[in-house]
Swiss-Prot record:
Enzyme class: transferase
UniProt feature coiled coil, ranges: none
Gene Ontology biological process terms in this record: antibiotic biosynthetic process; methylation
Keywords: Antibiotic biosynthesis, Magnesium, Metal-binding, Methyltransferase, S-adenosyl-L-methionine, Transferase
EC number: 2.1.1.307
Protein function: O-methyltransferase involved in the biosynthesis of the permethylated L-rhamnose moiety of elloramycin, an antitumor polyketide. Mediates the methylation of the hydroxy groups at the 4'-position after the sugar moiety has been attached to the aglycon.
Lineage: Bacteria, Bacillati, Actinomycetota, Actinomycetes, Kitasatosporales
Catalytic activity, as annotated: 8-demethyl-8-(2,3-di-O-methyl-alpha-L-rhamnosyl)-tetracenomycin C + S-adenosyl-L-methionine = 8-demethyl-8-(2,3,4-tri-O-methyl-alpha-L-rhamnosyl)-tetracenomycin C + S-adenosyl-L-homocysteine + H(+)
Signal peptide: none
Source species: Streptomyces olivaceus
Binding residue positions for S-adenosyl-L-methionine: 53-54, 81-85, 111-115, 167, 185-186, 191
Gene Ontology molecular-function annotations: metal ion binding; methyltransferase activity
Protein name (Swiss-Prot/TrEMBL): 8-demethyl-8-(2,3-dimethoxy-alpha-L-rhamnosyl)-tetracenomycin-C 4'-O-methyltransferase
Amino acid sequence: MTEDARDLYLDLMKKVLTNLIYRDAPIQTFVYDGEPDADPRLLGRDWPSVAHTMVGLKRLDNLQYCVETVLADGVPGDLVETGVWRGGSSIFMRAVLRAHGDTARRVWVADSFEGMPEVGADSHAVDREMRLHEHNGVLAVPLEQVRANFERYGLLDDQVRFLPGWFKDTLPGAPTGRLAVIRLDGDLYESTTDALENLMPRLSPGGFVIIDDYAIDACRDAVHDYRGRYGISDPISEIDGTGVFWRHTAASARSLQPATV
């Protein structure tokens, strides 16, 4: 695939995944202070009724940057997303691999496919306050539907692997091997912590961590608590007012490895 053809393909994929082409009606729209005129679909500020992703165009641009950078730099490892909704961001990662002719890396698609876990007395306090499970009528997307969405783009193949179940159950033993990009979209404190604890030690130096829900207090607290525990100081960069990312350094990678005796 020529460079021009690759750029056209990936640009069209982003517009189709976000449905910027036909502009389906939102189920719900979120307006942030200072953004009264912002386009919700560019910034991921709505829950679309039809589109295959709610992350918005800017976060897909960032995802493309991260995946293409690890490909160009030869950073070893697969790609993983935790919390995939209708699958759009994971589909896009597979599209980037296809566009660049990468036939070795896999895309790991981790989700309960049942929506958000119900909170209880033993759940984190901030998670209890949000009660996101009450929105599972929108947030729960069955595995069969996500697989079908991959298939619609011609991207369901052996390079796509699914990890169905709650993160605390599936991620510790997930057979991912090394990772180059980890994209976390679990919203909750506990979901974010489960993903960081289990996936960060597998992330290759030079790889990327993307936090979709950093604007949510519970998620942001989980990120800073985790980084504080392990002394991670890699600079955090903002994407669009909601998501952030950072590049994993060799020093941070060493801090996550068990001490040798």
